[in-house]
UniProtKB/Swiss-Prot annotation:
Gene name for this UniProt entry: hutH
Top-level taxon in the UniProt lineage: Bacteria
Identification of the protein by name: Histidine ammonia-lyase
Cellular component annotations (GO), alphabetically ordered: cytoplasm
Family: Belongs to the PAL/histidase family.
Organism of this sequence: Chromobacterium violaceum (strain ATCC 12472 / DSM 30191 / JCM 1249 / CCUG 213 / NBRC 12614 / NCIMB 9131 / NCTC 9757 / MK)
UniProt lineage: Bacteria, Pseudomonadati, Pseudomonadota, Betaproteobacteria, Neisseriales
Length: 510
């Protein structure tokens, strides 16, 4: 059993990748967090005993913030906000996303600025460790005031409401709590608001997009290197001197990855004196384009790392000052920007891949058989596979439109500017799936092209990559039912198996 010890505010991207990908991972709160959590909850109780009026603790919410709530209704207030705000719609989030949402919320609450009792946080930890995942609809948040609807669905289970998946079966929240050995919680003042206010759903979606983008980046670098080999491309564009004088670190690192993958190839030696002057941009400018994508991925990763460790609810409790302050940390604009930048990178990775694949099937450019198959005319080979790539690349261009530039006022104009971060992060999954499909087609095409270069072989690393594909998809000696091969190659692309072939330090969470 693998255990992740959470020291609040110190989660790494590699640990968050584990939360998303490792089903049996167990969480535990580091004991060092207890004092801050307890002090924060005690501050809320003390403020109430002093008769102070504080937003969200003894007032209404949003436009109703000026409504004072009687002491005997404070617990009902917290229960009511969870129930009324659980207004999401659409298919449930995947388990991997819910795990991230829960872990992020645990990490944030445990920093001790939310005024919530330790037993509530520990209940979330117990649900996570028992693999009891709240049913959280994917749609219904605008990323300010936090991810209210998604987090309300998560929180509803804690009070015995809503629904959760237990062993894959959808059950009422009360049943889920019993399955975890817990009683439904009566929320104390501030606790309902602390649970449902925050950016954890948007951040979870964006983190999953980040991890997918990293896997796609590696797969695209491998596929692009294979295409260089299949097309008898030049190594000169990857020379370190070219990239050093431009100075962009992403470009420098990208070129190094290509050099490492392409080193010591028989295919390269076979055409050293071919007289070719320059390759098309889709081969020659890979370090420049993929370097820019790497820069975007790294920048987004840093924003998301900070956000994953942030306190993003409202109001915030500063126990040392005996003070509770209202602000706007719930506004997910940083997450929206990061997700939009990831969308650009994912789209461009796919766009460049589609162009390389189109080059390979064009015998005038690649000097390979037309559409990468013998007996052309009878066989159509990769003709329509390229059309599929073009369709996916075009769809990604629309999906890459920045979500963060949109805003619709909510809550009777009290919340008059929102981030749309939840959609910004959520659409990354569709985009990543599209790009995995594009890369799958290129991978199939490039390996087919390299097989046509026999008896010459590629580098050891690229032969290893080709071997991973050939374990599942054989050479195309004639036309056959194509779709299953694309599916197998896409699964390989998305699996992260190619990550072992590159320097893991290049990408933030590897």
């Amino acid at each position: 059993m693998s255990i992740l010890n959470i020291v609040p505010g110190r989660l790494t991207l590699a640990e968050l990748r584990r939360v998303s990908r490792e089903t049996g991972l167990q969480l535990q709160l580091d004991p060092s967090s207890h004092a801050a959590i307890d002090a924060s909850a005690a501050t809320v109780a003390r403020v109430l005993s002093e008769g102070r009026t504080v937003y969200g603790i003894n007032t209404g919410f949003g436009l109703l913030a000026s409504t004072k709530i009687a002491p005997e209704e404070l617990e009902l207030l917290q229960r009511s906000i969870v129930l009324s705000h659980a207004a999401g719609i659409g298919a449930p989030m995947d388990d991997s996303t819910v795990r991230l949402v829960m872990a992020l919320k645990i990490n944030s609450l445990a920093r001790g600025f939310s005024g919530i009792r330790r037993q509530v946080i520990e209940a979330l930890v117990t649900l996570f460790n028992r693999q009891i995942y709240p049913v959280i609809p994917q749609k219904g948040s605008v990323g300010a005031s936090g991810d209210l609807a998604p987090l309300s669905h998560m929180s509803a289970v804690l009070i015995g409401e809503g629904e959760a998946f237990v062993d894959g079966v959808r059950v009422p929240g009360s049943v889920a709590m019993r399955s975890a050995g817990l009683e439904p919680i009566t929320l104390a003042p501030k606790e309902g608001l602390a649970l449902l206010n925050g950016t954890q759903a948007s951040t979870a979606f964006a983190l999953e997009g980040l991890f997918a983008a990293e896997d796609l980046y590696v797969s695209a670098t491998v596929a692009g290197s294979l295409s260089v080999e299949a097309a008898l491309g030049s190594r000169t564009p990857f020379d370190a001197r070219i990239h050093e004088v431009r100075g962009h670190q992403g470009q420098i690192d990208a070129a190094r990855l290509y050099r490492d993958l392409l080193a010591h190839s028989q295919i390269e030696q076979s055409h050293e004196n071919c007289g070719k002057v320059q390759d098309p941009y889709s081969l020659r400018c890979q370090p420049q384009v993929m370097g820019a994508c790497l820069t975007q991925i790294r920048q987004a990763a840093e924003v998301l790392r900070v956000e994953a460790n942030s306190v993003s609810d409202n109001p915030l409790v500063f126990a040392g000052d005996n003070d509770i302050l209202s602000g706007g940390n719930f506004h997910a604009e940083p997450v929206a920007f990061a997700a939009d930048n990831l969308a650009l990178a994912i789209a461009e990775i796919g766009s460049l891949s589609e162009r390389r694949m189109a080059l390979l099937i064009d015998s005038n450019l690649s000097k390979l058989p037309p559409f990468l198959v013998n007996n052309g005319g009878v066989n159509s080979g990769f003709m329509i596979a390229q059309v599929t790539s073009a369709a996916l690349a075009s769809e990604n261009k629309s999906l890459a439109h920045p979500a963060s530039v949109d805003s619709l006022p909510t809550s009777a104009n009290q919340e008059d500017h929102v981030s749309m971060a939840t959609f910004a992060g959520r659409r990354l999954r569709d985009m990543a799936g599209n790009t995995a499909g594009i890369l799958a087609v290129e991978l199939l095409a490039a390996c087919q092209g390299i097989d046509f270069r026999a008896p010459h072989q590629s580098s050891d690393k690229l032969e290893a990559a080709k071997g991973m594909l050939r374990e599942q998809v054989p050479f195309y000696d004639k036309d056959r039912y194509f779709a299953p091969d694309i599916e197998k190659a896409a699964a390989l692309v998305a699996s992260g198996r190619f990550n072992s072939l590159v320097d893991g330090e290049v990408l933030p969470s590897l």
